[in-house]
């Protein structure tokens, strides 16, 4: 069994190229995602700007899971800037297929939930999942999400 060093940290502008490559890879690994073989339609400059915007916001999170220095998963919470709905976070979590069923998705989601609880802004989290993705549905229910 291979050992990995896990590092969780917020995305930085310098991660833009690696993040695009990661999202393009995971988009082709699963048909449960809205991303597909076409990948993410952002260039490196646009991704860097997106990351910078997320980092500057008090109601958004873009957390990477790095295994031995390579992106293996991510969780994000995005929310609107409009006052009436800025407390509602949309959760997105994805893990490379090579690391499915090893607890990385749970680790990422638990970190995101902890962040949301301490954010002073986010009061409700929502996510979308295909019901045929039984492992994800089980995880989300286990962490308190309702379908």
Predicted stretch roles:
Residues 140, 145:
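Conserved active-site tyrosine of GNAT-family acetyltransferases
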């Amino acid at each position: 069994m291979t050992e990995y060093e896990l590092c969780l940290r917020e995305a930085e502008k310098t991660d833009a190229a690696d993040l695009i490559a990661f999202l393009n890879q995971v988009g082709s690994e699963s048909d449960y995602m809205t991303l597909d073989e076409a990948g993410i339609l952002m260039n490196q400059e646009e991704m860097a700007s997106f990351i910078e915007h997320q980092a500057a916001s008090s109601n958004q999170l873009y957390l990477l899971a790095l295994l031995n220095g390579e992106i293996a998963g991510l969780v994000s919470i995005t929310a609107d800037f409009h006052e009436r709905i800025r407390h509602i976070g949309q959760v997105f979590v994805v893990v490379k297929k090579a690391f499915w069923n090893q607890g990385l998705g749970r680790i990422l989601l638990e970190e995101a939930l902890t962040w949301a609880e301490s954010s002073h802004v986010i009061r409700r989290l929502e996510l979308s999942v295909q019901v045929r993705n039984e492992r994800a549905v089980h995880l989300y229910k286990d962490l308190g999400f309702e379908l």
